Amino acid sequence: MKNDRKLVRPAILVALCLITAVALVKHSSATIGNISKADLSGNWQMTLYGQGGCGVGSTLVTFTLNGSGSATNATEKSHSVGCGDTTSTGNTFTIISLGSNGSGTAGLSCGTGCGFTLSIQVSPDRSTFNVVDITDPNNFLQGVAVHQ
């Protein structure tokens, strides 16, 4: 009987810890369903880091997507080894293709004769998407965009 009591107390403590852990788990608010370009309309802020035509650098891009997944007001503020601090306005960001699971391709212009093709993955709740350049020679960019 005495041995049973020694086992019951730790068992109760473990059970209470499990109940507490389950109660504190945050449930996902991600919506289920197909992701479309229209889901992404609105203001975005994207950060990029990597190696490009100006060497290693970072860039902050702001843009407003319309319901078709296009923006013509992209502003890029960059800081790089080769070009220093620059600002480029009137650029485009366009979602070229987007699968129902949020995987797709986007294009970002950065002035005359300058642009990137980015692979993207939209989060299930449509609040962010990551980007990576895996197609443009000598450009190695990665980043994330946040819906504002």
Indicate residue ranges for each PLM-predicted region:
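Bacterial N-terminal signal peptides that target proteins for export
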Residues: 3-14
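Bacterial N-terminal signal peptides
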Residues: 13-22
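Coiled-coil-like amphipathic alpha-helices with heptad-repeat character
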Residues: 1-4, 21
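Mature soluble binding/inhibitory domains
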Residues: 24-148
